[in-house]
């Protein structure tokens, strides 16, 4: 799904010129991909994890990396023309503090793009099984301490000066089923120290080949499903916002 997330981000960044920021960049793969696709942009990125940033900074590829908390960004007011966040807000205690900081460092009219799991979205399997209440595997194994719906996020974003202007969707039926099965399996087995993709890449022999083939098949199905149903609500939102 990372390719789809990047595609939607780049579409949002198409009219943007100047300076952009990746908040919660991890090891920097998205920031570097944006810099490769848009070498005209000045790309900055930050994360709270020093170990992840050490990996990112080992080969920065033109991106300026910095250690920072999302709730307290070390940048000037209105410094950026666009900001994006992938899969971060569900992990923080006070998401409104993060959104206020994004609004602060964005110039008026600047673009904000966020990818956010919507495990409280009506008509999803997550909502049906009670994600975050009856079913808490993603809280324990994925650190998802917030459960969002599109309505909750849109209200919070508007309150913080970042009204939503467009929404795309992913994580429809296929990925919801697999996601729930995976975290339920973790509940039964215990932590495995990596994703399914990591395990498939590391496994040798026939078992590894089968896992890699299965992973590719699932990725293809998920991409097709998300592309076909991009305008129908799902378990993940790709929100475009504009700084008021």
Kindly label every feature range from the protein language model:
Residues 1-76, 82-86, 99, 169, ...:
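Conserved N-terminal segment of class I S-adenosyl-L-methionine
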Residues 72, 90, 155:
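Active-site micro-motifs of SAM-dependent methyltransferase domains
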Residues 1-4, 29, 59, 93-101, ...:
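S-adenosyl-L-methionine-dependent methyltransferase catalytic module, highlighting the catalytic core
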Residues 86-89, 115:
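Residues lining the SAM
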């Amino acid at each position: 799904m990372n390719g789809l997330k990047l595609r939607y981000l780049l579409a949002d960044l198409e009219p943007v010129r100047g300076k952009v920021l990746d908040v919660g960049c991890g090891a920097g793969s998205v920031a570097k991909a944006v810099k490769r696709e848009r070498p005209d942009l000045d790309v900055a990125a930050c994360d709270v994890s020093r170990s992840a940033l050490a990996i990112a900074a080992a080969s920065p590829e033109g991106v300026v990396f910095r250690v920072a908390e999302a709730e307290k960004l070390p940048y000037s007011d209105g410094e950026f023309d666009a900001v994006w966040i992938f899969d971060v807000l569900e992990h923080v205690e006070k998401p409104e503090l993060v959104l206020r900081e994004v609004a602060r460092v964005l110039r008026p009219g600047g673009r904000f793009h966020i990818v956010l799991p919507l495990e409280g979205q009506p008509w999803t399997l997550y909502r049906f099984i009670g994600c975050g209440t009856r079913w808490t595997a993603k809280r324990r194994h994925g650190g998802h301490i917030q459960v969002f719906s599109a309505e909750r996020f849109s209200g919070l974003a508007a309150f913080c000066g970042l009204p939503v202007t467009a929404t795309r969707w992913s994580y429809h039926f296929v990925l919801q089923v697999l996601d729930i099965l995976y975290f339920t399996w973790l509940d039964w087995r215990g932590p495995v120290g990596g994703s399914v993709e990591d395990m498939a890449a590391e496994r040798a022999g026939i078992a590894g080949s089968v896992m890699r083939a299965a992973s590719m098949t699932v990725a293809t199905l998920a991409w097709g499903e998300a592309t076909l149903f991009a305008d129908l609500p799902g378990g993940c939102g790709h929100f475009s916002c504009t700084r008021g």
